[in-house]
Amino acid sequence: EQVWKTFDPQARILAVRPDSTIPAVRLASGRLKNAPLPLRLCYVQSAAKFHSETLSLLCEDTQAGVELMGEGSAQADAEVIALAVEALRAAGIRDFLIELGQVKFVSGFLEEAGLTAQQCAAVRDMMAHKNALDMQLYLDRLSIEADVSRRLMRLPQLFGDAAVLDEAEQLTQSPKCLRAIAHLRQVLSILQDYGCADCVSIDLGLTQQANYYSGVVFHGLAAELGQPLLSGGRYDGLPAQFGRPMPATGFALSLKLTLMALERQGETFAPPVPDVILSFAPGGLRSAIAYAHQLRDKGVSVALLYGLTAEELHQRVDSGEASAAVYLNGSVFEQYGKAVF
């Protein structure tokens, strides 16, 4: 329901890419099928979804993401989560939090309660929206014991620090749930080694919209936004659908929401300036082009300007339009400003 669809001239249904995980899995199972594991892939590309509740906010977005395939350990989960933390830090987001959940804990909890598949889907949807009132009314209509209903109502409230895991263990006897909790404890321990455990909290009622997630899932929240700007998790069953069974995890960062968060932080975005601006005396164009190529080969960004005098170049450096200037006068290179080459 959240995929944009259209038709081709033969009336076949076409879908706009809703996320980047499935294309990455298809790549790993096709062109990269003989590549050694684990695979570490990254991408920056557009995706589009139909958001019925936030249609006016965004539909198409550019995502930057990573996928780690072929490694199913807690270390792999922690590596990807730590990378998500570093991505938000590198982007300049100052006040953020990564919330961790566990799909297997939720599914085990609902199975233990004896709910049908349809009932589980309804409860998951209400948990995703933190809609406690509707969830309580829905459970009241079901023929389940009061104690089961009480424990189910605790599920969306199981969020906070690691102490939440202790409470969760007291609410269930399901081996599936207990294994999921133990796995989360491992991930949290490894995140301590990465030095980013203070950026992480637990939300055992956390769910994802995509139905292919199978283990640890997470969201990245910024104080300036009312919705996640980053999401990801483990999707071990998905690669097998494309002919290459293997564990996998990853995340995607919304660049549109990241820019929105930065703007609300008060960040301003100045246009980039070149390292060097370069101009030349009459008849010196060929030499100037050759010199610009030499600098660019060394990793120096160069803007070639036409018809400026040496004095005008100096003024532009002084005004902050470049770090340095070079004026080519015959065979003489007149340099001004910071030495970056």
Where are these regions (language model features)?
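Short terminal or interdomain "cap/linker" segment that borders an active site or interface and mediates
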Residues: 103-139
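Positively charged, Gly/Ser-enriched RNA/tRNA-binding surfaces
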Residues: 11, 19-34, 40-93, 139-341
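Polyanion/phosphate-binding surface patch
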Residues: 1-15, 57
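A conserved hydrophobic position in a structured secondary element of the catalytic/binding core
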Residues: 16, 101, 253
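Short, conserved phosphate-binding/catalytic loop or strand-edge motifs used
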Residues: 60-64, 100-108
